[in-house]
Each structure stands twice: as C-alpha cells, then as structure tokens.
Amino acid sequence: MENMPYSQIQKGTFLIATPDIDSGFFFRGVILICEHNANGSFGLLINKSLDLELPEEIVNSEHLINPYISIRSGGPVQTNQMMLLHTSSQIQQQTLMITEGVYLGGDLQFLQDAITDQNGPHIHLCFGYSGWGAGQLEREFLDGHWFLHPAELRHVFYISPDKLWQHLLREMGGKYATLSMIPEDLSLN
C-alpha cells in the first residue's frame, strides 16, 4: 500500500510522522484524524501512553475493573482536557464515529459505567489534542512531515502503542517498511 495523497486527509485516516520529524512531541507519532475541513483539522495522538493517576472524582481506582482502559497523550493543545476514544456504539447521541467501530465522545457517567464493567468497551482517555489551522496540515504534508494511512479499529485498540508507528509503515510496504527499521536513536546504529 502506498502513501495516500494529501487530498485523502479526512476523518478516519492516520497521520504517521515521517522520519523528518526526528524529535519532539510528534516524533514517531500516529495521529487519528477526527475532523478535517476547510477551517482546519483536529486529531488525537494515539501512540503516546501517559502515566497519570486520575482524580478520584473521575475514576475511583477501587472500581476500575475494565481491563481495556488506557491513558494517552492526545496532543500538545489543551493538555488538561480529556477526550474519550472508545469502541461503544451505545451512546450514539453523544459520540462521533471516526471510523468503523471507533467513536469519540461520551460523558462522565458513560466513563464511570464503562470502567466498572469487566467486559466494557476499549477506551483511550486522551489528554490534549492535535490541531491545525486552515491549510496548515496540507502544507506540512507537502513538506514531507506526514504519511497517510486508513485507520481501523484494530490499529487504534489492539496494537501496542509503542509498536504502532512501525506496524503501520510495515503495512504500507516497500520503502515505508524499510523506514520502519530505522532505530529511534541513530547513535545506536
């Protein structure tokens, strides 16, 4: 599978950081595009785990029995804001379907119910988001900072976040698969 053209940037696609982004927040980042229109773009960085302890009014750890809850850094914008990315279609009036089986949204009651359900939905608690103004993302794409790949539920929830960047490049094949073998720290090469 080849890299998609920038005209294919849309809700439900991944932005995959190219090796040109060699440091910083988006280094080896994978961003799920949640909205893209003439006014700009919004997405969630889904492959950077956060080690946070959530306030008890949000999550009472004694009641956390859902094994499918994870915490992610959604991006560098408004990092004190939490968004729910999940697999539940039960609250459609509160959510936006990003791609088949992947939803954005929900309220505190949904979260509290989900964490106490051993068979509950997969949920990424995303702190912050990634955003671009009108035309900004297209310029970054044309400058060689991003590859595009269609997002699927299995990518979002079933592949380890620290392996997702490499996994997607390998799926793309060819020169992209070769790029996936570049070590994170080039001094180790």
Curated annotation (Swiss-Prot):
Q: Which terms in the GO cellular component ontology are assigned?
A: cytosol
Q: What domain of life does the native source organism fall in?
A: Bacteria
Using the record for this protein, list the coiled-coil segments as residue ranges, or answer none.
none
Q: Which family does it belong to?
A: Belongs to the UPF0301 (AlgH) family.
In its UniProt entry, what is this protein called? UPF0301 protein pc1755
User: Which organism is this protein's natural source?
Assistant: Protochlamydia amoebophila (strain UWE25)
Lineage, opening ranks: Bacteria, Pseudomonadati, Chlamydiota, Chlamydiia, Parachlamydiales
